[in-house]
Curated annotation (Swiss-Prot):
Binding site for Zn(2+) 2: C112, C115, C118, C126
Record keywords: Metal-binding, NAD, Oxidoreductase, Zinc
UniProt name for this protein: Glutathione-independent formaldehyde dehydrogenase
Function: Dehydrogenase that catalyzes the NAD(+)-dependent oxidation of formaldehyde. Exhibits lower activity with acetaldehyde (about 10-fold lower than for formaldehyde), but cannot use methanol, ethanol, 1-butanol, glyoxal or formic acid. Is involved in formaldehyde detoxification.
Pfam families hit by this protein: ADH_N (PF08240), ADH_zinc_N (PF00107)
Organism for this UniProt entry: Bacillus subtilis (strain 168)
EC numbers, comma separated: 1.2.1.46
Functional pH dependence: Optimum pH is 9.5.
Amino acid sequence: MGGMALTGNKAVVYKGKGTVAVEDIGYPELILRDGPGVPKANVNRKCEHGVILKVITTNICGSDQHMVRGRTTAPEGLVLGHEITGEVIETGRDVEFIKKGDIVSVPFNIACGRCVMCKTQKTHVCLNVNPDRPGSAYGYVDMGGWVGGQSEYVMVPYADFQLLVFPDKEQALEKILDLTMLSDIFPTGFHGAYTAGVQTGSTVYIAGAGPVGLAAAHSAQLLGASTVIVGDLNEDRLAQARSFGCETVNVQKHDRLGEQIEQILGEPTVDAAVDCVGFEASGHGNQGEAPAAVLNSIMDVTQVGGSLGIPGLYVTEDPGAKDADAKTGSLKIRFGLGWAKAHTFVTGQTPAMTYNRNLMKAILSGRAQIAKAVNATVISLDDAPKGYSDFDKGAAKKFVIDPHGTLK
């Protein structure tokens, strides 16, 4: 159906440091062709277990921005986008359960469903989709070369295992701005809060008021936190956090986070903390970029025996880092402090499939209001470069690309 009837496919393409463009990349096939970032072992990989989606929504993510800023080794020509929601318009011959017309959420982790990691729900480190290292994602550096989904159409492999089918198509379209967050940031934020041990009555500090930080804050509320404090240096993003009931601290105005927390809680520590910033962190006060700043500060303010959820991205190669150690992902972390306080650290990609079905139920029931929390803002595919620019400038928005004008 799709391959014969359609030929064009506009997509967001990385063109080098600071630049993305919307270009025609050709209609997808059920095969992974050679291209930017595709390892030799993945070239011409057949995907009869896959489907072609007509993309309904695809979101700009903070981890996309790391690449666009030139802070990774992403190759020019890489098609971006790993937050994908769409309608199935073509199925491979080995697809048994997914049907044409299904509206689905695509977990950003690509996972085969067959390896020992997938069978133990560690889909974020699948062993069979990326020849270079465990784990994979669409449109991302060193992640297997799978073509990104900031496009009109995209191929998704291992469809029966991976895709989350929405039970009612009409309801799904009504709630699409919430449901589009299931591909990444809602599970990622929830994973951060959940692995930090947030439960009924917890006090929580969230580092970062970008979309993932706001998703973690909303998730902490869903998990029963009594007080959620969000820290950032962007006043617009802090105002967005306050809009749904969070307390906030501007970390640029003070170099002692514990004192800021004490002004809110009456004590300088929290039960749980979540790092939603990652390696492009800024130091407290006016210290400028300091990659270990967030990790060190959350160790400082998390109570003895507490847990730290770390969904913020850290990399093994950072060509834009200011010192030689940081270029290889080596950070000056006060690990002795974490050891002395018996902290638990949970890092890595989020296994989105662990959480997305239950979070879908929370959205469909009205319990979760994730689009409101992250200020979901719809833009056209042609406006994606401006969306990247505005997001890079600190816009307090989660940009949702609508490639076909479905949401008008």
